[in-house]
Amino acid sequence: MVWTSRICFRKYGNFVDNVRLYVRGGTGGMGLPRLGGHGGDGGDVWVVAKKDTRLKQIKDKHPDKRFIAGVGSNSSIQALRGAKGEDVEVFAPTGISVTSDHGRMLGELNREGDKLLVAKGGRGGSPQSGFLPNKGQTRNIRLDLKLIADFGLVGFPNAGKSSLLTALSHAKPKIANYPFTTIKPEIGKVMYDDHKQVSVADLPGLIEGAHVNKGMGHKFLKHVERTKQLMFVVDVCGFQLASKTPFRSAFETVLLLSKELELYKEELLSKPAILVINKMDLPEAQSHFQELEAQLENQGESIHLFSEDVIPKSLMHFTHIVPVSAMTGHGLPLLKSLIRQSLEEQDTIDTEAQRSQKILELRREIPSSSIPSWGLPQPT
């Protein structure tokens, strides 16, 4: 038996998934030459992960989006060592990445309490600097929220992702028979009778050219990175975005989705993935599905029928291929079972990999003569 529930992701109004900030460490304090006194260091700027915080709160509370730490105290007769300037903390949600304006990754905040130094304060005046202080570090940074979910639904507009999410959970994304119905991420939770929960993220539909940010592709592709597994959702009868765009068969759709992920970030194709073939209630769906099955089984031969701009360098390997109808419920019990099975298999593999890595590290630290060799993988 399986039942469903809903998780509400958007607690506030407009969904904000990124924010750009100006941060500056405090200037150090002046030294005192005649007594050899040291000025205090300037304060630092930190980004801190805090529960129940949203990026929208930062924009609302700090419209100028400027965070400047305190200046270090000057050295004086009363205090030869000046006090450090006051630190500034920027509270942000968990599950964000922090990058510089130049695109350099500064770090990630994945758990509550995680802290990241983003602007260091300047050193106070000292004999080494002629008792003159240094200015604090100045930079613009970007905070990007990436959804953290077990599965991310990947598909072109109108593939039925929103309908599938509704069928799998009680999330209620907007559903209509036209492309781009979903314009904001939506998360649903599937709950099983033993209280196991699996989160599924419905991401806005991709279009061809998403990897170069067409249709705000980067805005949506980045969320895929923080899902454990992917779930491709494909219309069994094919897809056409508009009358002036080419019609794509179901197999072409699979290739194009893989291509877009590959061009954005190739390692995304190494994620475990389930292929869901939706709309099996439509006329001639069975014959289309049989054709797709044959093409997937003989991908090496089938891809030569398509142009190179459609074909990814690496073909996506799907752990399961499941025909369903989100409208009638056909195939959904099997899909729910496979969703859980796939996650449990990944957890087992990850646990074993971590165990092997720890053992290898232990062997490097301890002489081989002092520990038994049975059951231990040999270091490479």
From Swiss-Prot:
Where does this polypeptide localize?
Nucleus, Nucleolus
Per UniProt, where does GTP bind? 155-162, 202-206, 278-281
UniProt KW Nucleotide-binding keyword: yes
Q: Which InterPro entries match?
A: G_OBG, GTP-bd, GTP-bd_Obg/CgtA, GTP1_OBG_dom, GTP1_OBG_dom_sf, OBG_GTPase, P-loop_NTPase
Top-level division of the source organism's lineage? Eukaryota
Query: The OBG-type G domain covers which part of the protein?
Result: 149-344
Q: Which residues form the Obg domain?
A: 13-148
The UniProt entry's GO biological process terms, in alphabetical order, are:
ribosome biogenesis
Q: Which GO terms describe its cellular component?
A: mitochondrion; nucleolus
One GO term in the molecular function aspect is: GTPase activity
* Pfam families (UniProt xref): GTP1_OBG, MMR_HSR1
Major location category of this protein: nucleus
User: What are the record keywords, sorted?
Assistant: GTP-binding, Nucleotide-binding, Nucleus, Ribosome biogenesis
Q: PANTHER family this protein is in?
A: DEVELOPMENTALLY REGULATED GTP-BINDING PROTEIN-RELATED (PTHR11702), GTP-BINDING PROTEIN 10 (PTHR11702:SF43)
Its biological purpose is as follows: May be involved in the ribosome maturation process.
Tell me which family the UniProt entry assigns to this protein.
Belongs to the TRAFAC class OBG-HflX-like GTPase superfamily. OBG GTPase family.
Q: What is this protein called?
A: GTP-binding protein 10
